[in-house]
């Protein structure tokens, strides 16, 4: 017993305190011997650092305690557990701890001395220098790549934040639109208002239509037709004055000739250009004296010409919004055109 005490007095304090701490049965819930009594296990590292380390070593650093164990040759048995083993650290045999020695740290001057004892050749030295330079370059490249990756990560995070803000703004805008549409659709008179608006819009489009070009063309064609008839009557009057010998012909033949021209005037094609015809020679039969007296005293076609100009002004100034077909009077009816033939009857 005295031998054991004497041997333990020469042991390092760390080993002595560690043995006492592990061998204390009151702390078996925190640290205890393993089943084979050749290693010890730290079951609760947090409580071990908080309660036991301050009591035996006056600090709470569990990592420092592990480094001390490594210094004295302890090794970890199970990577999943805090179990440490040393062949000379056995339960009930504290005297074996005298074989445990602290490892000497390796310092830089020791390496220099080792190199001095074993000098390198020139080729080995150059090879090692090249390898060191290559490793430095690789290190610089890795650091640059790391910086680039870090910069890209920050930019990506900024883009994600911006997109989130835009998404939230769009969601709020969409909600406001949906709420407004729901409020508008909830009004009872909405459908009627929409129908009235569509009807007014259609009426405005119909009223804003320009005058039909086809109607204007028909007016121009009719005007040219009237001019043609005016010239025809004038030539007939002149030729009838020159041929006075033919005035004694039967009036019935003249009436028949004029009657033949009446249906022709009522069948004028308003959609075609007036044909250019050669004036036939005046009939040799006599005509009505009253008819030729009226032709010589009046300006044939003047009344019709004034009516044409008046009607064209009415067509051009029709801006009241009503349909052209409803208010326009087609003055090119056969009745107006046949005025010439009626005078002859």
From Swiss-Prot:
What are the alphabetically sorted keywords of the record?
Answer: Activator, DNA-binding, Nucleus, Phosphoprotein, Repeat, Stress response, Transcription, Transcription regulation
Any one Gene Ontology MF annotation carried by this entry is: DNA-binding transcription factor activity
Expression sites (tissue/organ): Expressed in roots, seedlings and at lower levels in leaves.
Q: Composition bias, kind Polar residues: at what positions?
A: 296-308, 317-329
Q: Where is this region: Disordered?
A: 240-329
What stretch of residues is annotated with the motif AHA1? 226-235
Q: How is it modified after translation?
A: Exhibits temperature-dependent phosphorylation.
Q: Which Gene Ontology cellular component annotation is one that this UniProt entry carries?
A: nucleus
Subcellular localization is given as: Nucleus
In which broad location class does this protein mainly occur, judging by the first location in its UniProt entry? Answer: nucleus
Q: Which PROSITE patterns match?
A: HSF_DOMAIN (PS00434)
Q: Biological process GO annotation list?
A: fruit morphogenesis; lateral root development; positive gravitropism; response to auxin; response to heat; root development
Q: Where is this motif: Nuclear localization signal?
A: 199-203
Q: What happens when the gene is disrupted?
A: Plants display minimal right-handed slanting in roots, reduced gravitropic response, reduced number of lateral roots, reduced size of shoot and root in the seedlings and increased resistance to 2,4-D.
Q: Which domain of life is it from?
A: Eukaryota
Known DNA-binding region: 11-105
Motif span (AHA2)?
A: 289-298
User: What family is this?
Assistant: Belongs to the HSF family. Class A subfamily.
Q: Which PANTHER family match?
A: HEAT SHOCK TRANSCRIPTION FACTOR, HEAT STRESS TRANSCRIPTION FACTOR A-4C
Domain annotation text? Answer: The hydrophobic-rich region (HR-A/B) corresponds to the oligomerization domain. AHA motifs are transcriptional activator elements.
Oligomeric and partner information: Homotrimer.
What's the stated role of this polypeptide?
Transcriptional activator that specifically binds DNA sequence 5'-AGAAnnTTCT-3' known as heat shock promoter elements (HSE). May be involved in general response to auxin.
The name on file for this protein is Heat stress transcription factor A-4c
């Amino acid at each position: 017993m005295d031998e054991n005490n004497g041997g333990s007095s020469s042991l390092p304090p760390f080993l002595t305190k560690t043995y006492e701490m592990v061998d204390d049965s009151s702390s078996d819930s925190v640290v205890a011997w393993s089943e084979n009594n050749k290693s010890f296990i730290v079951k609760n590292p947090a409580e071990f650092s908080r309660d036991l380390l301050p009591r035996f070593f006056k600090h709470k650093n569990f990592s420092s305690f592990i480094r001390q164990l490594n210094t004295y040759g302890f090794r970890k048995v199970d990577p999943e557990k805090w179990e440490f083993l040393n062949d000379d650290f056995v339960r009930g045999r504290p005297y074996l701890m005298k074989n445990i020695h602290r490892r000497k740290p390796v310092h830089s001057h020791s390496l220099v001395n080792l190199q001095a004892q074993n000098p390198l050749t020139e080729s080995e030295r150059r090879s090692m220098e090249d390898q060191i330079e290559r490793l430095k370059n690789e290190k610089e490249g890795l650091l640059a790549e790391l910086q680039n990756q870090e910069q890209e990560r920050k930019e990506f995070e900024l883009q994600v934040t911006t997109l989130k803000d835009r998404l939230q703004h769009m969601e709020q805008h969409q909600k406001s639109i949906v709420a407004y549409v729901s409020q508008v659709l909830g009004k009872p008179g909405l459908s009627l208002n929409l129908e009235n608006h569509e009807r007014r819009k259609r009426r405005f489009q119909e009223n804003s239509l320009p005058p039909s070009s086809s109607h204007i063309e028909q007016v121009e064609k009719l005007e040219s037709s009237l001019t043609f008839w005016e010239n025809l009557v004038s030539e007939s009057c002149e030729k009838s004055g020159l041929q006075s010998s033919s005035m004694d012909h039967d009036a019935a033949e003249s009436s028949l000739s004029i009657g033949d021209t009446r249906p022709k005037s009522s069948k004028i094609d308003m959609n075609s250009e007036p044909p250019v015809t050669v004036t036939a020679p005046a009939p040799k039969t006599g005509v009505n004296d009253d008819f030729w007296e009226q032709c010589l005293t009046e300006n044939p076609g003047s009344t019709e010409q004034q009516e044409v100009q008046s009607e064209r002004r009415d067509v051009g100034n029709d801006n009241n919004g009503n349909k052209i077909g409803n208010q326009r009077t087609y003055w090119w009816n056969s009745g107006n055109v046949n005025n010439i033939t009626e005078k002859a009857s």
